[in-house]
Swiss-Prot record:
GO molecular function, one term: structural constituent of ribosome
tRNA-binding is among the record's keywords: no
Record region (Disordered): 1-22
Source organism, top-level taxon: Bacteria
UniProt key word Ribonucleoprotein: yes
Name under which the protein is recorded: Small ribosomal subunit protein uS17
Any matching Pfam family: Ribosomal_S17
GO CC field: cytosolic small ribosomal subunit
Species this protein is from: Kineococcus radiotolerans (strain ATCC BAA-149 / DSM 14245 / SRS30216)
Length: 94
């Protein structure tokens, strides 16, 4: 029985979601607002539609600026609205 509990504790916590998006605001301390684009097919007309969602992401070292393309990953709730963290800055704004 102890082998099962130790094996269960060392297993992965499941697949965490990762998203790419552009930073639209960096005015908060250690927080950036990232706009994530999702392409969905319309159920009736079958046209591909671009849907955007704004999420708040934790940026511990405050490296991301407005216009940067960033990779964000899902994490535990850090505040009332923050459930994502910045993994890396993929492309700097020009």
């Amino acid at each position: 029985m102890s082998e099962q509990t130790s094996a269960a504790s060392t297993t992965d916590r499941g697949d965490r979601k990762t998203r790419r998006g552009y930073v639209v605001s960096d005015k908060m301390q250690k927080t950036v607002v990232v706009e994530v684009e999702d392409r969905v097919k319309h159920p009736l007309y079958a046209k591909v539609i671009r849907r955007t969602t704004k999420v708040k992401a934790h940026d511990e070292v405050e490296t991301a600026g407005v216009g940067d393309l960033v990779l964000i990953a899902e994490t535990r709730p850090l505040s009332a609205t923050k459930r994502w963290r910045v993994v890396e800055v993929l492309e700097r704004a020009k």
